[in-house]
Amino acid sequence: MGSRPTPGLQRTTSAEYRLPSTRPPASVPSTAPGGPVVGRGPTGGPQAPKAKWSALGADGVQRDQLWRELLEAERRSQQRWAQNWSFLKDYDPMGNKKEPVKLPDHVPRFSDTVPNSTNRAVGSRVDTPLGKTLIGLDFFFVEGARKKKLEEELQPI
């Protein structure tokens, strides 16, 4: 709880500004001249998985940069899909052109078949068979939350 730093986490200011990293950004290859060789231990062999994760956890800025690059690549690929493949939405799986769905000219604001309801108060169409069914379903749905009289053996003395 004190002000001791946690190992593996970078210190941040109150504005969530991360301190500058000493490592190269994610876009720079790790085998750049003068840069560390990632994935190799002191003897040149592969690092243990625990050491690999601790190395990743120590540099949040690099992970953040990598995440931003991945998001940008995803956005670009979505735009390319719209340019290259969006024509497929006009065809069915057999390759036939789909007919566009004709929307009605006028749609009434209130339904004739479904009762209007707001805040558990069913609207003006309660006398319809569907409205009566909904009231019955609502009655059984909230049954567990209702106060009930205790059975005789559970009554206080």
Curated annotation (Swiss-Prot):
Top-rank lineage group of the source organism: Eukaryota
Chain intervals for the UniProt region annotation (Disordered): 1-57, 92-124
Keyword Transport: no
Segments passing through the bilayer: none
Positions with biased composition (Basic and acidic residues): 92-109
One Gene Ontology term, aspect cellular component: cilium
Protein name, per record: Ciliary microtubule inner protein 5
Organism: Bos taurus
Upper classification of the organism: Eukaryota, Metazoa, Chordata, Craniata, Vertebrata
